[in-house]
Design a protein with these regions (language model features):
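Acidic anion/phosphate-binding donor-loop and adjacent secondary structure
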Residues: 199, 205-207, 215-230, 250
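Nucleotide-activated donor-binding/catalytic signature segment of Leloir-type glycosyltransferases, i.e.
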Residues: 274, 281-308, 315
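Conserved donor-binding/catalytic core segment of Leloir-type glycosyltransferases
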Residues: 20, 232-259, 272, 392
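N-terminal subdomain of nucleotide-sugar transferases
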Residues: 6-79
């Protein structure tokens, strides 16, 4: 995997480390979820280390285990990774209370594993923020080295989105965030804003590493059978979004742009929304109410089928709601999938990714909330295939 932390590289240089890795939403490439932790674990195994992955049962994910759960868990080895999968189902469509309870149950069960298991170093990755709890116990009760990877700043992001408003809950989360950072021997941030956010809590810069999301580019070279969702013809321009259909993703921007395109008579441009999430029914109803036939919805697909889909696409959509905390405080999986597939990217919010796209000439960046500009850019891309090809090549190089 590209862009590994010097601290992790140092770990890889040591012999026969036993790594206890906590990621509640872990998935192999057979699932329809991000595989950063899978790639990290595989790299550690390839370098001679033993990795035990502790995870839950994430909707859309696939741990590679299919045996029945016994006493609340099932275990096995997948691609050299020892896996402990806890019987804790989770879906992005679950309500706030149910998701919170699942997070807490995972943390409690993980503490027990951290206190009993034999290992040399513990690695925990968010989200959720509660993933850091077993690392805290490992650090202070067993004096184990603890590496904490931060994928999103909590509680800053849910507070900015007004998903969580209760001051007591926000205060508790802020305390947990501080304790997790201060307990870790090293913190990893996935974006410049996340690194700055960690440092703002008093963590010395020398203990923080920037390791942006990446992708195993070899996966995207293994194209099998390119395909398109039903309703999109081979001669049509296809823009694709892959990922969660939730509040953070701001997919209402797609509906607004699609309406502009349909009013302009651009029947040659289609938008595929691939994934699931709590707001998917709402987005589907918005499109239906406006009579839009240029948006096609599709269920989540495993990584290999995603590779084949992207091989048939013309441009990838990197979309988020217009929340300033997102501008520098996120590192989305789908952006790195797009560029690994050689897809130019259309991004609809300012920040470090917009700057990266413009700097490397690998796509387009439009202002948030501007449906006309969004539609204009899709039209421009559809009408300038030679330029689009160059941007796709630059994306793969990046």
């Amino acid at each position: 995997m590209d862009g590994e932390s010097p601290f992790l590289i140092a770990l890889m240089g040591m012999d026969n480390l036993r790594v206890l890795y906590f990621h509640q939403h872990f998935s192999t490439p057979q699932g329809a979820a991000g595989i950063r932790s899978y790639q990290m674990a595989r790299n550690l195994v390839r370098n001679g280390h033993q990795v035990t992955m502790v995870c839950g049962s994430y909707g859309g994910g696939n741990t590679g285990l299919d045996t029945p759960f016994l006493t609340g868990k099932r275990t096995g080895q997948v691609d050299g990774i020892d896996i402990i999968e806890l019987d804790l189902a989770y879906s992005n469509a679950d309500g706030f209370v149910k998701r919170s309870l699942t997070f807490l149950k995972f943390a409690v069960k993980s503490i027990g594993i951290a206190l009993r298991h034999n290992y040399d170093v513990v690695f925990a990755t968010t989200t959720p923020l509660t993933a850091g709890i077993p690392g805290i116990f490992a650090r202070w009760l067993r004096r184990k080295p603890f590496v904490f990877e931060v994928r999103d700043l909590w509680p800053e992001l849910p507070k900015a989105m007004e998903v969580i408003k209760n001051p007591v809950v926000l205060g508790a989360m802020s305390s947990l965030e501080w304790l997790s950072y201060r307990s870790a021997h090293r913190c990893i941030g996935l974006s410049p804003g996340i690194v700055d956010g960690i440092a703002s809590r008093g963590v010395p810069r020398e203990r923080i590493q920037l390791v942006p999301n990446g992708c195993d580019v070899d996966i995207f070279r293994q194209v099998g059978n390119p395909w398109r969702p039903e309703g999109i013809n081979d001669d049509q321009f296809m823009a694709v979004f892959t990922g969660t259909h939730g509040q953070a993703n701001g997919l209402d921007a797609v509906v607004a742009a699609a309406e502009v395109l349909q009013n302009r008579g651009r029947e040659d441009i289609k938008i595929a929304l691939v994934g699931d999430g709590k707001l998917k029914p709402q987005i589907q109803e918005m499109a239906r109410a406006k009579g839009l036939d240029n948006i096609v919805f599709h269920a989540p697909v495993p990584k290999q089928k995603l590779v084949d889909l992207m091989a048939s696409a013309d441009i990838g959509l990197q979309l988020l709601a217009n929340v300033p905390a997102f501008y520098y405080g996120t590192s989305p999986n789908n952006f790195f999938d797009y560029i690994s597939a050689g897809l130019p990217v259309l991004n609809n919010y300012p920040g470090w990714l917009a700057g990266l796209i413009q700097q490397h000439y690998c796509g387009y960046a439009v202002a948030p909330g501007d449906a006309e500009a969004f539609a204009d850019t899709l039209e421009h891309a559809a009408d300038n295939k030679r330029e689009l090809k160059v941007k796709g090549q630059r994306a793969r190089e990046l």
